[in-house]
Structure formats: C-alpha cells, structure tokens
Amino acid sequence: MRQSKIALVTGGSRGLGKNMALAIAKKGLDVVLTYNSQKSEADEVVKEIEALGQKAVALQLNVADSTGFEGFFKAVGAALSETFSTDKFDYLVNNAGIGIHKAFAETTTDEFDTLVNIQFKGPFFLSQLALPLLADGGGIINISTGLARFSTPGYAAYASMKGAMETLTKYQAKELGAKGIRVNIVAPGAIETDFGGGMVRDNEQVNNFLASQTALGRVGLPDDIGGVVAFLCTDDARWITAQRIEASGGMFL
C-alpha cells in the first residue's frame, strides 16, 4: 500500500502552478507536475519537493495539443509504477494556462482558438482521459479567475473560457460523484506573478489601483492561492464539491 496520496499538477514548473505543487507537497502528498518547455525549471521544483520529504516527477505536456494526451497518460502510468509503486493518482489540478489581453472587438480567431485549446478543450479532455488513472474518492481542482465574476475590458475571451470551466466543474461533480470524486474550481483575483507579462507584480500603478479595489487592501500573492488548492487535496475538504471558491481578497465588491 502506498504511503502518500499523489496529485498531478499541470503547469507546475512556475508561477501559481509551482506554488500549488509545493503547497500540496507540504500537506504530505507526492506530486507529478507538468511543464511545456522549461524542463530545467520543472526539475528544480522536483528537487524542492524532494527536499520536503515527498516524491516528485516532472513530465512534458502541451495542454494546447489534445492529440498528445493519450501518450502523456502512458507516461503518467509508467511514472506511477516506477516512482510511486502504484497505478493510480488521487488529485488532478488543471492549472496550466495563458492569458491574452485583447479587446473584444480586436480578438482574432487564432487568439480565440488558442485560448479554447489551452483553457477549455485541454482541461476537458485531459480530465476525461485521466479517469482510468484517477482513484475513487479523489478529486479534480479546476482553475478559474475573478474575471468570470467581474468585468475588466480586454479579457472577454479569457474570462469566457473560465466561465465555461466553471460550468464544466458542476457537471463533472455531478457525473463523477458516484465514484466519490470531488470537483471544485478555484478563482484567483489579481496575483503578483509573471502571468500577463507580470503586469500586476511589476506595474506599481496597476498594483496600487487593484489593491484599492480589494477589501483586504492588497493584491494577492502565490501563497494565497497554493494553500487553497492544497486544502482541496486533503480529506478535510471531503464534503466540498461543485463549488467555485474565489480567492481574491474581496476584489470589486
């Protein structure tokens, strides 16, 4: 019998995904994390997780290309057997994504299709193909955005994909509940990362404005999100499913 539960975190080599992976490891879980192109960054996260006393593996995954998902899960199955001595993992965190800031009237079909593939089609079919390896009683954690609740010009396409993920979350929870699989979605507000070119982190004017519009008086930090996701990967969250959990500090109330 394996000692630790296992979480698979997409986009776990940097930004919020890295923080999620480390926060999950601090809860005593082992981690499979994915990266798109930055293998060296992913390997460093693996080392940090191992330093916490947990096992970790980094695998390449392009979430935009669903034709590669079947091969990816063959690699996951091999890693589960070789590194973790099991054939199942417990939690899937659909974190990988990009942001495109473009006015509705100027968004191109190529930009729209890119967002669909990465932010909706990818997580939809990745979750579907994960099911044979996802243990009963486990969970799926999807990632949304505060922009699905409030509107900021330039994010029509991005926020629409996240709105679709919020609807999908409820259907997944309904259809997978018979297996004890919980499905929730976490919606971060403005966070200081390199997302969107680091605008929230590096632009003092933007940072100050967003802080002034937040009940808790500041913008978010990666630690504010990683801990929420990690909590959902524990038995303490066993009675929580089909929920949208916004972690924004109370933006635009």
Map each language-model feature to its residues.
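Conserved glycine-rich cofactor-binding loop
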Residues: 13-15
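Conserved glycine-rich Rossmann-like NAD(P)H-binding loop of the short-chain dehydrogenase/reductase
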Residues: 29-44
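Substrate-binding pocket helix/loop in short-chain dehydrogenase/reductase
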Residues: 89, 103-104, 108-116, 210
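Active-site loop-to-helix junction immediately N-terminal to the catalytic Tyr of the SDR YXXXK motif
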Residues: 107, 147, 151-159, 171, ...
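Active-site helix of classical SDR
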Residues: 127, 161, 169
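Alpha-helical segment proximal to the catalytic Tyr-Lys
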Residues: 132, 174-178, 238
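Short C-terminal tail/terminal secondary-structure segment
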Residues: 150, 230, 241-253
